[in-house]
Amino acid sequence: MEIIYKICMVIELLQLSVNNGYDEYNMLQNIEKSENGFTNEVKGMPFDEYKQWLKKEDDYSKSQNLPDNWIPQTTFFLNIDGIPVGIGRVRHYSSEYLEQNGVGNLGYGIAKPYRGKGYGNILFENLLIKCKLLGYKRIKLFPYINNISTNKIMLKHGAKLLGTINDEKHIYEIEI
């Protein structure tokens, strides 16, 4: 019997594009509409509407067609060996309104088939780099207290607990 070891993987954090297709769409079907505070509008959406959603999200990254009180944000897909496994968003700056409502500077989700493989940690690390490139010195995050995996990832990256919101969300700050 021949044993083959995989010694490396190709990790890519790719900015959402209007040209994204079925691979990303299918991955998004494996993340709930609202799970642990992360919103996935694409769950259950027909593919033709998904293409319109891509355009809307691309516009948001360019500060175009934003709803009132929204901050520009860029959406990224995490690909491992060419396969989309997760999605993340980075807001271009912070606001008092978002913080008062427990909305952090970044958010992410990993598709169910790919959980428990360390991809959440990889995605989070790469989103922190994007935050730094946007000029953040520190970010605030508001994970649900019962979201054990995300809390562990944030603490691993130096999150300092500042408090809680209504006994359901932690308030963390990370210096980057």
Can you say where each PLM-predicted feature lies in the sequence?
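Short coil/turn motifs at secondary-structure junctions
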Residues: 93-95, 113, 146
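Conserved catalytic-core motifs of GNAT/GCN5-like acyltransferases
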Residues: 142, 155-174
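Conserved acetyl-CoA-binding loop-helix of GNAT-fold acetyltransferases
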Residues: 108-110, 116-129, 152-156
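GNAT-family acyltransferases
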Residues: 2-105, 166-176
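Loop/helix-junction capping segments adjacent to catalytic residues or to phosphate/diphosphate-binding pockets
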Residues: 21, 117, 148
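Conserved beta-strand-loop-alpha-helix junction that forms the acyl-donor binding cleft
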Residues: 141-151
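Conserved GNAT acetyl-CoA-binding A-motif
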Residues: 133-142
